[in-house]
Amino acid sequence: MMNGLRRTFWSSIHKKKDNNRVDDSLDRQKPTTTSRFGFFSNPSTPRSETRPDSVTCSPTIPCQSWSATAISTPSPSLPASPKLQCDTSGDVTPTRNRSPLSFLSVSSSSSTPSSPKSPASFSLLKSKLCFTKVRILNRNNQVNIFKNNSKLTFLRLCYEQSSISSSKCGICLQSAKAGRGTAIFTAECSHTFHFPCVASRAGDRNLLSDCPVCGASWRETSLLPLSLSSSLHESGSESDSKIRESKNNNKSLRVYNDDEPLISSPISRTGFNTIPESNEDEEEEDNDDGEFKGFYVNTPSPLTTKKMLTDSVTGHVDVKLSSEAAIVAVGRGNETYSVLMKIKSPSLPTARRSPVDLVTVIDVSGGNIEMVKRAMRQVISSLRETDRLSMVSFSSSSKRLTPLRRMTANGRRLARRIVDDISGDGDGMSVNDAVKKAAKVIEDRRQKNLFTTIFVLTDRNRNSAHQAQLAQPDFVTSTRFSHLEIPTHTIWLGACNHALPEDVFAKRIKSLLSLSVQDLTLNLGLVSGSGQGKVTSVYSLSGRPVWLGSGLIRLGDMYGDEEREVLVELKSPSSSRSQRIMTVRSRHVDPTTQEIKNYEDRALMIPRPTTVRSSDPSIARLRNLHVSTRAVAESRRLVEVNDYSGAERMLTSARALLVQYGLSSSDSCLRGLEAELADLNRLRGRHVAVKSPEPVVQKSEPLTPTSAWRAAERLAKVAIMRKHMNRVSDLHGFENARF
């Protein structure tokens, strides 16, 4: 039967009459996949009516150039036999290039037809066995390959061999099996490629927009380089990439950009500035007298308004020295003494207070949650319409309760309702996460007020080393958080032995919301005519003792009527008994106008230093305060450079000196040093635990088939070694069986 089919098939070959039939056949060709034996396929299978225009012959198999057409006779088993054509130029030279990717240049010149009896059947059968898929594409990945007077500009034949379905790369045709040390990329069409092969084609977007094997469009390119992924998505799937990027950002870190617009935003979405909402109480007061007051009413003039805006700018920072100075050390020809300095910021009128963006972090894990709610209601009442408030609660986890919302009448009502509904229970260990979330709210806001701050409300007690040194402990501690230098105030409601009066608490909250001076710096010195001497060190007493500097100290931002204390250490010759004068020059930035204000030097009389032998107990207290404050501040400077031994020696020597002075264990200075020693030991233990030698852990590598294979091999080796170590003889247990 096969011989009959072969005779019937080849008897229908005749010579080609016209060379233009090549062009017609190529125009009718479609990028379809042919089977290996097209003339034995199912009748329903689509067939290619032509064959490639040139054939690269193997040097071991002779192939003459020929031009013929084979038309099969219809039969029940073969209703539509294909029509075969093969044209080559007259001078066909054998080549040894067996690369699977070949580029064929087709000439428009006609070739001389050869005899139809040439032995091309075996070559045709060989080509059918070697090639599985043939696809002809031009530069635009279209089927039509003729342009500019029917001249072929670019022709690419992409084909697969019969064995590259899943085990070879579709680009380099090398082995693409897992475990060979090369990352494998599997496309949506299930074709596999080497990842370096795919990445190397990132320069041309057309090369990777479709699969090099089957031509399927690639849409999921998450494993490709970012530049490649962006170029591919620009061509067809920009919306999909934006959705995926937004999902990834939401998974990593949420963005809080849903803040309410400011009351007088310079740029409004609608194109005009909104009208400020008035207070209901003010409307009632204004509507009390509805009579016409005439044309000459007492309205504030522009000059009066300007004066009101500049009242706080002209206020100086008040600096005073205490009336005592205690000698703390006596050396050869000089003596060291210390004196207290009090700094108070000017008061700020409520009308001139800058709008504030406030984020409150509420601790709902304590037992006295009603105290926290009462304090939060007082904070809400202290805000104005131009202020914005956001609330974050935390217990075992943190949660943002409200976005930044203006405190209008409706805003206050909604905030109070949320505070009334607060209830929680937990261990309160997520305070750091809550503060980070509060800082993220401030960082992601779309519109910004001039002043921002964070309040942390908790009913816990302060348990710190520096707090024990203060005679009157404060229930507010201040610091700065994150790279934005956000002022963060922790209000320790549990530190108050009794409930604070509402007016005292409200006054303190308003002072924390009123930024009086910004970036305050003081330049301290001694008048040259008042004897030789210098300022050696300045230590902060507000909060944790910190070394501020020697002559130029930076105090940062200060709020309305805020008071701070610093301890100034001076050194002067012992023989000089003249009156010494200190000069103070202040410099700060006005928070409203952002103008830099420099003030002239002010002279302060330094009190005469007194030894501790005097009967005044304040001198001994000042000396003890200097010893403990200096030890804590200097130990912290040593801890910053990881000198834990030096810091411990500093604290222990100061403690021994205070014990030598006759202080009892209940003294605040001794308790502060002991608490600082406990903190230092905890920090040292943590530092040693980090630097302690740990078992060698191999570097983690990305999860790939190669890494998984290596991990499996390591586990197998460990299992074999354990089995070998636990192996016993076959006669184990039968030594005393007496065979």
Curated annotation (Swiss-Prot):
List all Low complexity biased stretches: 99-120
Catalytic activity annotation? S-ubiquitinyl-[E2 ubiquitin-conjugating enzyme]-L-cysteine + [acceptor protein]-L-lysine = [E2 ubiquitin-conjugating enzyme]-L-cysteine + N(6)-ubiquitinyl-[acceptor protein]-L-lysine
Tell me where on the tree of life, at the top rank, the source sits.
Answer: Eukaryota
Q: What's the name of the protein?
A: Probable E3 ubiquitin-protein ligase EDA40
Q: List, as start-end ranges, the regions of compositional bias called Acidic residues.
A: 278-289
Species annotation: Arabidopsis thaliana
| Gene that specifies this protein | EDA40
- One function term, GO molecular function aspect: zinc ion binding
UniProt region (Disordered), positions on chain: 19-56, 72-120, 232-291
**Per the record, where are the segments of Polar residues compositional bias?**
31-56, 86-98, 265-276
Zinc finger (RING-type) residue numbers: 169-214
Q: What results from gene inactivation? A: Embryo sac development arrest. Unfused polar nuclei.
- The Basic and acidic residues compositionally biased stretches are 19-30, 235-248
**Can the keyword Thylakoid be found in this entry's annotation?**
no
A single Gene Ontology biological process assigned to it is:
polar nucleus fusion
